[in-house]
Amino acid sequence: QWPSSAASDVYKRQKLNFDVRKIFAPEHGFRGTEPNGANINDEIDIKTGLKIVSLHGKDRKYGEIDDYDLNEIDILIFDIQDVGVRFYTHISTLHYVMEASARNNIPLIVMDRPNPNAHYVDGPVLDLENQSFVGMHEVPIVYGLTIGEYATMINNEGWLDNNMKSNLTIIELKNYNRKVTYDLPILPSPNLPNRKSINLYPSLCLFEGTNVSAGRGTEMQFQIYGSPFLNKEKNNFRFIPKKNSGSKYPKHENLLCFGKNLSENKKLDKFDLSFLLNAYSDTNDKQNFFNNYFDKLAGTNSLKNQILSGLSERKIIQSWKKKLD
């Protein structure tokens, strides 16, 4: 049994007289309630009295721990629920935490958790020219590893700066089976509200690099897609994105969008390129379909160029399958 949340785990450690000095919070904040991309300030946690150091604030490089924040730290513990997708930023935060651990010779304990997308590997492998906080390593979009396995890979592949090694300990999962579907004890972030959204996230997050909405600003985030520019005869699902707690500035806010509702299809639990290809085929605004963020999410310039050139889905998939074998 793993803790339901990092917050509850901190409270338990305090009651057991562990000397917890501070909390480092990734994107979405300590309790996972902040919207994506939000700059979060440092604060004092009301319940524990501990300082929360935001690793997603405007005054620091996302994910990085400053050395002075580790002056009184003997051991670092990394306990975050990941979803097993390259552009979900917790593995980038893990990379920087491991660098801070190695740089300051502080042991790091990673609490392993189930990966809800561990049952397969798929998608284009990142080219380092497109390296960013939404993709730091040469892995496919869906990489099939738990967070503990991923930490071990970072160390073993020499991906840390100057080939440093973190003094790493993994608290492993007992009796874990990646073929079994686990209901996560907590929501990973505000816009992944259920298992279907988590399974569709690898496919639909690519729309963040286009003029198509993936449902932010609705109650069906990453379970629907659409835009005002899609052919409404072929895309008969309607929705209007509105500002909410999970999305302060949703794409196409207050505009009627035409698209597809994927929430009821139980078979959609793997990466599927057809949603993106169909949306591009159905758009009335091909010239502005892609934005500059797309290549960062895809991890390569090739995917966009293949779509623009009219390459078939089968041939596009074949082009990245070679690197996965």
Language model feature labels by segment:
Residues 131-203:
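Conserved anion/nucleotide-ligand pocket segment
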Residues 1-7, 11:
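Single conserved hydrophobic/aromatic residue that forms the stacking wall/gate
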Residues 10, 208-218, 225-230:
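Active-site loops and adjacent core secondary-structure elements that bind or stabilize anionic groups
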Residues 19-27, 111:
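Short internal beta-strands
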Residues 82-94:
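Glycine/threonine-rich flexible loop motifs
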Residues 32-36, 109-131:
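Glycine-rich, charge-decorated loop segments at or immediately adjacent to ligand/cofactor-binding or catalytic sites
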Residues 221, 225-321:
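Conserved functional hotspot residues or short segments at active or partner-binding sites
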Residues 41-72:
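Glycine-rich oxoanion-binding loops at beta->alpha junctions
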